[in-house]
Curated annotation (Swiss-Prot):
Protein name: Redox-sensing transcriptional repressor Rex
GO molecular function, one term: DNA binding
Location(s), subcellular: Cytoplasm
Main subcellular location: cytoplasm
Ligand binding (NAD(+)): G91, C92, G93, N94, I95, G96
Matches recorded under InterPro entries: CoA-bd (IPR003781), NAD(P)-bd_dom_sf (IPR036291), Rex_DNA-bd_C_dom (IPR009718), Tscrpt_rep_Rex (IPR022876), WH-like_DNA-bd_sf (IPR036388), WH_DNA-bd_sf (IPR036390)
Gene3D superfamilies: NAD(P)-binding Rossmann-like Domain (3.40.50.720), Winged helix-like DNA-binding domain superfamily/Winged helix DNA-binding domain (1.10.10.10)
GO terms, biological process: negative regulation of DNA-templated transcription; response to redox state
DNA-binding region boundaries: 17-56
Keywords for this protein: Cytoplasm, DNA-binding, NAD, Repressor, Transcription, Transcription regulation
Pfam families given in the database record: CoA_binding, Put_DNA-bind_N
Job of this protein: Modulates transcription in response to changes in cellular NADH/NAD(+) redox state.
UniProt subunit comment: Homodimer.
């Protein structure tokens, strides 16, 4: 199947949502789904669904709908969800601890397999209730290379985010999900996704205010 390499970022961000929808359809024993059904489940319009799917070649036939099992497996392959992806976390503050207890693997084959913080943090040398070990940041290079991990979640204060990101990249990390509200300078080939809770909340409040006008 031919896949267009120049997929827009907006489409790429919807891939995991499509996968989730098709898994839900499959669980509900739905065999075929129309673009309208998919769009309604996603909260978008049918044209967007068809445009997104066009980047991946022939996923369905007009008038016949989309084969749910086929599409579920397609997105599983695309998102590499057939094998477990181990992720590390740096920063065991409030957000970090919440993520350490979040069961990513209940929905997808991702799991936080180790956590890090400053060497004198009280959690260093312990394990979470789920058995995730917490190590000192000074040991991150050795642990990352031994575990062959390429993905990290960053939940450190903004004043330390760049320094820690540099350490992660030096250790071999290729992708970072950052909760720190600063833009990270990274080499070409390193992927960073940002989660800014304050910005998201402000955007929500803006739209709420607009809806009242």
């Amino acid at each position: 199947m031919a896949i267009d390499k120049s997929i827009p970022k907006a489409t790429a961000k919807r891939l995991s949502l499509y996968y989730r929808i098709f898994k839900r359809f499959y669980a509900d024993q739905v065999e075929k789904a129309s673009s309208k059904q998919i769009a309604d489940a996603m909260g978008i319009d049918s044209a967007t669904v068809r445009r997104d799917f066009s980047y991946f070649g022939e996923l369905g036939r007009r008038g016949f709908g989309y084969d749910v099992t086929k599409l579920m497996n397609f997105f599983a392959d695309l998102l590499n969800d057939h094998s477990t992806t181990n992720v590390l976390l740096v920063g065991c503050g409030n957000i970090g601890r919440a993520l350490l207890h979040y069961r990513f693997h209940d929905r997808n084959k991702m799991q936080i397999s180790m956590g890090f913080d400053v060497d004198d943090h009280p959690m260093v040398g312990t394990k979470t209730a789920d058995g995730i070990p917490i190590y000192g940041i000074s040991t991150i290079n050795d642990h990352v290379k031994k575990a062959d991990i390429e993905t990290a979640i960053l939940t450190v204060p903004s004043t330390h985010a760049q320094e820690v990101a540099d350490q992660l990249i030096e250790a071999g990390i290729r992708g970072i999900l950052s909760f720190s509200p600063v833009h990270l300078q990274v080499p070409k080939g390193i992927i960073v996704q940002y989660v800014d809770l304050t910005s998201e909340l402000q955007t929500l409040l803006y739209f709420m205010n607009q809806s009242q006008d």
